[in-house]
Amino acid sequence: MTIQGNIRVLEMSANVRVTQGTLEILGDEAIFEYDANSNELTKVTVHGTPVRFQQQLDEDGALVIGTSDTLLFYSDELDETILELVGNANIESPDSTMRCEAIIYISDRDLIREAAGPCQGMLSSQPN
C-alpha cells in the first residue's frame, strides 16, 4: 500500500475479483484508490486479458455482461455507479449489444452514456 497525496493506493494481482451487490468484476490485477482522510473507496481500476464483468439487472435474473482490456469502476457526481470499459470494450444485455474501443456504462440504469469508436452493435430502447 502507498499514499500518493490524499489518495491511498492498494494494488492486488493474480485472479482479482471485485464485487459490490450483484456486480462482479474479474481481472488479472486491480488498483484500489481510497480517500486518505475518509478511507472511502473512490475508484477501482482492473486490468486483464480480458477484464470480465457481470451484473444482475433485475429479480428475474437478467444479466449484463462485458469485457475490456481495462475497467474503471467509480461513482460519479450524481452518485451513480460508473463502469468505464477501455480497449476492446464489449457489453451485452438482454436488449443490447455493443462493441467499441471504449464504453462508459451507468450500471444503476443499464445505460450506455458514451461510446468511442469505431463501434458496432445494436441498441434497443428499454422501458423504465
PLM feature spans:
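Mature-chain termini and adjacent capping regions
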Residues: M1-N128
